Amino acid sequence: MYTLARQLLFKLSPETSHDLSLDLIGAGGRLGLNGLLCKAPAQMPVKVMGLEFANPVGLAAGLDKNGAAIDGFAQLGFGFVEIGTVTPRPQPGNPKPRIFRLPQAEAIINRMGFNNLGVDNLLARVAASQYKGVLGINIGKNFDTPVERAVDDYLICLDKVYAHASYVTVNVSSPNTPGLRSLQFGESLKQLLAALSQRQQELTAIHGKRVPLAIKIAPDMSDEETVEVARALLETGMDAVIATNTTLSREGVEGLEHGAEAGGLSGAPVREKSTHTVKVLAAELAGRLPIIAVGGITEGKHAAEKIAAGASLVQLYSGFIYKGPALIRESVDAIAAMG
C-alpha cells in the first residue's frame, strides 16, 4: 500500500509531497486511523536517560518541525517522536526549491534552513496532542541571531519547551544555518553546554523534574574532534548524544541528478559515516552517556548495526520516506532478534 502511495507522492515536488504527507499523517492521527493502516511493532520497552521508551525506534527531528502530526506518527508505531527543529521566532527558511530526492541512492539533500512557525506555535500543537509517550523537542537558533549570541536562542527555547518535553535536543549540527556547526568545537561548545547545564539545573528546581538534554552532532568531524565532543559532553553533564545529522559529503551521489545541490545529504549514503561516528563515541563514552543513532537506516538490519556499534536507540528519517511505516516494525524486529 505504501509503495502505491509513494509512487503518487513522488510525482509531486519533494516539499509539496512532504507537506501533504504530514497533513495526511496528522489527520489519520486525529481520527485514530493510522494504527489500522499498518501492523504495529512488537512491544520492546527500553529505558534510556531515565525515560521509558515503548521501543527503541524513533522519528528523527525534521519531518515534523512544528509538531503538527505527533499523534499520527506515534500511531504508526514509533517508540518515541522528536519534533522540531524549532527556533524562538518563526522564520521562513531558505528559498525554494530546497529539498531534492535522489532515489537511485535512497538519499535526500535538503537546505531547509530551520523553517518553522516558532516555539510558541509548536507548544500549542504539543498541548493539543493526545500522545503520552516520549516526546523530544529539538531546538535551534534563528537565522539572524549572530552565532556568538546563539546561546541566548537556545536558552529561550529551553525555558519554553522544558515543561512539555520528555527530552530536549540541542541542534548544533545543521549545515544549513551559517556558522552553526562552529558551535560543535572547542570553547564555543563548552560554553554553550555549560550555559545549558546551568539552566537545566535551574529549571529542574522550578519544575520539580529533570528533563534530559541531548546534543545532535555532525558526521563530518574527524575522530579526534568527535572524541573532544564526547569529553565535553561528559564534563558538562549532558544526558545523551545524537549521531548524526546530515553530511556535507557527496560520496555516493556523485554524478546523480541533484547530487551537486547545496545542503545536507541524508539517507543511505550517510550510513557508514554515521555508524563510524557512533563507534568512535561509544569507545570514548564507554557506557557513561547513551547514544541515539540516526543516519542511513533503510532496512531493519541497519538499525541493528547501529545498536551493535554502541547506540541505545535509533531514529528514522529518509529511510521512512523511502520505505514507509513498515520500516519501523522491521527495525524493531531486527533489534529484538539481536537477543
UniProtKB/Swiss-Prot annotation:
GO BP: 'de novo' pyrimidine nucleobase biosynthetic process; 'de novo' UMP biosynthetic process
Gene Ontology CC annotations of this record: cytoplasm; plasma membrane
Membrane topology type: Peripheral membrane protein
Entry keyword set: Cell membrane, Flavoprotein, FMN, Membrane, Oxidoreductase, Pyrimidine biosynthesis
Gene3D superfamilies on file: Aldolase class I
Domain of life of the native organism: Bacteria
Binding site residues for FMN: A61, G62, L63, D64, K65, T85, N138, N171, K216, T244, G267, G296, Y317, S318
Cofactor entry: FMN
Annotated metabolic or biological route of this protein: Pyrimidine metabolism; UMP biosynthesis via de novo pathway; orotate from (S)-dihydroorotate (quinone route): step 1/1
Compartments reported by the entry: Cell membrane
Catalysed conversion reaction: (S)-dihydroorotate + a quinone = orotate + a quinol
Annotated S-S bridges: none
Cofactor note: Binds 1 FMN per subunit.
Binding site for substrate: K65, N110, R111, M112, G113, F114, N171, N176, N245, T246
Active-site residue numbers: S174
EC number(s) given by UniProt: 1.3.5.2
InterPro entries reported in the protein's UniProt record: Aldolase_TIM, DHO_dehydrogenase, Dihydroorotate_DH_1_2, Dihydroorotate_DH_2, Dihydroorotate_DH_cat, Dihydroorotate_DH_CS
Task performed by this protein: Catalyzes the conversion of dihydroorotate to orotate with quinone as electron acceptor.
Entry's family note: Belongs to the dihydroorotate dehydrogenase family. Type 2 subfamily.
Xref: NCBIfam families: PRK05286.1-1, PRK05286.1-2, PRK05286.1-4, PRK05286.2-5, pyrD_sub2
Description of how the protein assembles with itself and partners: Monomer.
Official protein name in the record: Dihydroorotate dehydrogenase (quinone)
Native source species: Pseudomonas fluorescens (strain ATCC BAA-477 / NRRL B-23932 / Pf-5)
